Design a protein with these regions (language model features):
Chain A
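Long, charge-rich, low-complexity alpha-helical segments
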Residues: 28-89
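Long, low-complexity, charged/polar intrinsically disordered regions in eukaryotic proteins
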Residues: 1-30
């Protein structure tokens, strides 16, 4: 996942807010995914902004530590491989 | 915080919501967890059922497990399933298969967000029919054939018992050979199951064998049924925890809300959807709040396997008069209780299939 990528949720995935972040359920393969609070602004961005831009904003507001960004992008890439999110082309 | 700790404290809505639509059934299986057979006169009406589905949609319930009784005996079954799916609540329904004709099979195959589980409790008519009733194996098999002809990837749910344990390979081959997927679930002493528990529960040797068999067959689903067996080694697939009132609950045909489908008992009733909203019951019922704060205590807490089985199934304990803080009666470290003979006579007999009601 590059910082310049934009992501959107798969059409067959439903997202439900929970205390820890959100639960995502894929109707395509009937899989359930736990979405951590810190990941939610990326997963739920509807392809509107680059993931790097979202990360910078969260770091600036103190909601995210810069050091945590690469790990989050790796998890996001994992969700992309599982078809939960797609990179908007 | 681990996913266990997060889930134990409850969610905004259930992950796994079982809706027993009706207690009416054209079979009378000896181990029925809801003692089904006769329709409750005060069953939720079509309008009440739709209002409930509207509420679940607003709560963003992802899918519901529809069961009974035999859900297809409800005259509004197809209407309610379509209503649910139109609101983006996926449906997994359990059926004995007797009412799946070609028309129903076509409807199932052409409907998105719909999964079907056909209940089969043995790989032969001899084993299955002693539990589910004469002719039930061939009728279930016919339903499987009809769905296979439509190219639909159906599931078969098998409650494994000491009589059917030796047939697991045979059933797996039968189901996968037809393009289906096998789901194996645990017998509970719930409903009529209480009367046949001693005769049908697995022996400890079979429980160990089942653990190894499930580990060797990752394509087989379990509905997180056997988390008590995860104490034997590497955890089985799933959340490996009791979800009652935390991630699971059950709504019965009258709208009573229970902590899980296996504890349809007053002690585990959280409320009724005719008295308050489902969302209120889910989030505020004292019973559910208590369950979310509770963990199995007692000797389990000092067991090295606690992190994998979390003390086992609450329903099995409740219906065997075992204190909830005691280990699961089928704890893998417990000595054998009761006989180990494979065929013990059953104290109940299934009823032959009743004619299907007109659709």
């Amino acid at each position: 996942m590059r910082r310049s990528d934009r992501v959107r949720l798969d059409d067959a995935v439903a997202l439900r807010p929970e205390k820890f972040g959100a639960l995502a359920y894929s109707y395509r393969d009937r899989q359930l995914f736990f979405i951590d609070q810190r990941l939610l602004p990326f997963v739920d961005s509807a392809g509107a902004r680059q993931v790097g831009e979202i990360a910078d904003e969260l770091v600036a507001s103190g909601e995210l530590q810069e050091a945590a960004v690469p790990k989050l992008l790796t998890v996001l890439e994992g969700l992309r491989r599982k078809g939960v999110v797609h990179v908007v082309i | 915080m681990s996913s266990y700790d997060v889930l134990r404290q409850g969610l905004n809505a259930p992950i796994c919501l079982t809706w027993e639509m009706t207690y009416a059934c054209n079979l009378l299986c000896v181990h029925c967890l809801s003692s089904s057979g006769t329709r409750a006169p005060d069953e939720l009406s079509t309008a009440e059922a739709k209002a409930l589905l509207d509420e679940w949609a607003a709560m963003r319930v992802f899918y519901i497990n529809v069961g009974g009784g035999e859900p297809m005996t409800r005259p509004d079954f197809f209407e309610l399933m379509e209503y649910s799916i139109a609101r983006r609540i996926g449906v997994k329904f359990s059926t004995n298969g007797t009412l799946v004709d070609r028309e129903a099979a076509r409807w199932i195959a052409s409907t998105d967000y719909l999964d079907v589980q056909i209940s089969v409790d043995g790989a032969s008519a001899e084993v299955n029919d002693a539990i589910r009733g004469d002719g039930s194996f061939s009728r279930a098999r016919r339903a499987m054939e009809l769905l296979a002809e439509e190219g639909f990837p159906f599931k078969v749910n098998h409650v494994v018992t000491r009589r059917s344990f030796a047939q697991l390979d045979g059933l797996h081959a039968l189901v996968t050979g037809m393009g289906g997927q096998l789901r194996v679930t645990r017998l509970r002493p719930s409903g009529r199951g209480r009367a046949v528990w001693d005769a049908l529960k697995l022996t400890q040797e079979q429980n160990r064998g089942l653990y190894a068999w499930l580990r060797a067959h990752p394509d087989v689903l379990t509905g997180d049924s056997f988390f008590h067996l995860s104490a034997l080694g590497a955890p089985l697939d799933g959340l490996n925890m009791c979800g009652a009132g935390r991630i699971v609950c059950c709504v019965d045909p009258r709208g009573d809300v229970y902590a899980c489908p296996f504890v349809l008992a007053d002690e585990f009733k959280a409320g009724n959807v005719r008295d308050s909203s489902f969302a209120t019951i889910w989030s505020e019922s004292p019973l559910f709040e208590r369950l979310r704060g509770w963990e199995v205590g007692g000797q389990c807490r000092s067991c090295g396997a606690y992190g994998r089985c979390h003390g086992g199934c609450m329903a099995v304990k409740h219906f065997t008069d075992t204190p909830l803080d005691d280990p699961d009666p089928e704890c893998v470290f417990a000595p054998e209780s009761g006989p180990t003979t494979t065929v013990i006579p059953l104290t109940l007999s299934p009823r032959p299939i009743r004619p299907a009601p007109a659709r």
